[in-house]
């Protein structure tokens, strides 16, 4: 039982680290100039924690079957307490992930609008135009 408690604590700690990374990602996405290297590093760290959490979940499932207990662990106070904290962290992570996704989509949209405007400008720049007096203008 102690091993299951430790695994659930590890899952909670990894989720808290993931939450910290999501806040860093959010702060970086809000900046007008995004540091791509920082974002890439954050993504790599998020992938690391997600793999670690997936591995811990497999161990947790094995121990739950072995002890024949399952979430929300109502009959075990310590497990239930940690499980409730995990659930609340997951809700916060979901909200932050949605915020990050919205900001990222807005940045892509603005970037695409800029590229489209720039292409139109370049196309118009190559066109030959004539002034009021009929002479070529550049």
UniProtKB/Swiss-Prot annotation:
Localization in the cell: Cytoplasm
Pfam families linked to this entry: FlgN
GO BP: bacterial-type flagellum assembly
SUPFAM superfamilies: FlgN-like (SSF140566)
UniProt main location, coarse: cytoplasm
InterPro entries, per the entry: FlgN-like (IPR007809), FlgN-like_sf (IPR036679)
Aminoacyl-tRNA synthetase found in the keyword field: no
UniProt KW keywords: Bacterial flagellum biogenesis, Cytoplasm
Gene Ontology cellular component annotations, sorted alphabetically: cytoplasm
Task of the protein: Required for the efficient initiation of filament assembly.
Family: Belongs to the FlgN family.
Protein name per UniProt: Putative flagella synthesis protein FlgN
Species name: Buchnera aphidicola subsp. Schizaphis graminum (strain Sg)
Gene name for this UniProt entry: flgN
């Amino acid at each position: 039982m102690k091993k299951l408690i430790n695994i659930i604590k590890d899952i909670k700690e990894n989720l808290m680290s993931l939450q910290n990374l999501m806040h860093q990602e959010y702060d970086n996405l809000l900046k007008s100039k995004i540091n791509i290297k920082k974002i890439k590093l954050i993504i790599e760290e998020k992938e690391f924690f997600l793999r670690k959490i997936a591995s811990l979940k497999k161990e947790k499932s094995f121990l739950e079957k072995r002890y024949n207990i399952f979430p929300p662990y109502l009959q075990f106070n310590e497990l239930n307490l940690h499980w409730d904290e995990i659930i609340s962290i997951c809700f916060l992570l979901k909200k932050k992930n949605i915020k990050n996704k919205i900001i990222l989509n807005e940045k892509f949209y603005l970037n695409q609008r800029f590229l489209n405007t720039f292409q139109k400008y370049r196309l118009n720049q190559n066109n030959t135009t004539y002034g009021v007096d009929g002479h070529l203008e550049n």
